[in-house]
Amino acid sequence: MKKRLLLITILSFLWFAGICLAGEAPHQISVFVLNRDIADFKDYVIMETAIPVRYMENIEEVEIKSIKGLKTGYIAYATCAAPGHIVRIKLKYKDSSKKFFKNLLKQIKKKYGEPDEYRGDPFHILIAWKWSFVDKEGNRISLNLQHNTQDPDQKMGNAIKLTMRNLVEEDQQCYRLKADDPREKLRQRDWKVMDSGLSEGDFFMPR
């Protein structure tokens, strides 16, 4: 029994070590860095495009400006637990070829090891790989790389996504706790705009 427990412990350690030590956990793609303030990248994003992420209203997402080598991109950041901190980087490369994808996949494998999960379809119309990491601070980070040239329901071409999972979850939890506060629920209601009935001069000036 003791030997079995020891074996399970060793295997669990090796599995965890494999996640952590296959390569240093990535935090950056292009100029964008996870857990940094979105304000640090104001020259690379269009803040006026900020909208809540679908099904995650607490997370906001902005479009990137034109950056060499990239076609499009969206940077998501927290608004509750760590306001402004980047939680996800989604970029689409300008080069949509499979050759580019294979070369990038090869480089990622060389640096971070084999992917942990295949997320594409069995026919390889959509090819998608996922890596999972835990960095030195205990942050859980996922990296997704995909190639798609036929599935219209997915982003066409070559796309990459880097997400700090725990930061997303912490922000969602923060948002839920605030929403549970009766006062916060009242603030979030779509209240009718009231008219004071005062003239502009009387309204703005102290009397």
Question: Which residues does each PLM region occupy?
Answer:
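Bacterial N-terminal signal peptides that target proteins for export
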Residues: 1-7
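Sterically constrained small-residue positions within well-ordered secondary structures
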Residues: 13, 69, 80-82, 120-122, ...
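Mid-chain, structured segments of secreted extracytoplasmic proteins
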Residues: 63-107
